[in-house]
Each structure stands twice: as structure tokens, then as C-alpha cells.
């Protein structure tokens, strides 16, 4: 796969004991070792965290707009992350992840990945993106991300 457009760091660690995260070093797990699509989607997801760091003004504008669209966003596992702020970030990230997956693996496989993740973690966030992707997409595009 040509993932160059979604690479924002080349410093990557693979650690089978860690939950994937983007900072301080982008770290991926081996949980989905037998599913290339899930591995690829996780890679794009974590790289997108780094992309938001590179565009703080656009990122802040998108979060402000999402707060208006989703004033009562779920907080806490498994529906979301540990804060509303991080959930707004994740709506952006998951939208970009879904669009990247569509380009890299096609709509059917991308949808299957999102469906799986909507039953795994950040459940509400992934379900919301599947339900109405363009609602978040309009915000992402309008903010310049």
C-alpha cells in the first residue's frame, strides 16, 4: 500500500503488550497480526493523531464545530475515550481513518473494519461515523484538515 500521504512520523515501535498510541513514539500492537486491514487502519489512525499536531489552528476549529454538533458526547470506555476533548479529536481521526481506508482497501473492506471497531472500542464514535460520515466530514473539510 502507498501510505505516504498518511505518514507523519517514521519513528514507530511494534510492541505486542501495548495499546496503540501516537505519543511520545507511535506504537502499534500485534493484536491484529492476522488481519492486514485492521493493522493498516490502526497505522493510519495513529498517524492521524500526529497530523492533528501539525495543524493546530485547523484542529481547534474542527473541535469547536464538533462541540456544537455533539454537545453531549459519550465519555468513557467502551463508547469513547476518557474525556470529551479526546472524543472530539477521535471523531476527526476516525473520519480521516475511514476515508483513508476507503482509498487504500476499498469501500467494502473499509466498512468491515469500521464495523468491527464499532464493537471493539470507541464504539459510539465509530458507530456515529458509520451512521453519518458526512456530518463530521463537512466539519473536517471546512476546517481545512
Task: State what each model feature region is.
Residues 26-44:
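Short pre-active-site segment immediately N-terminal to the catalytic Zn-binding motif
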Residues 102, 106-145:
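Pan-zinc metallopeptidase signature
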Residues 87-102:
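Short, hydrophobic/amphipathic alpha-helical patches that form generic packing surfaces
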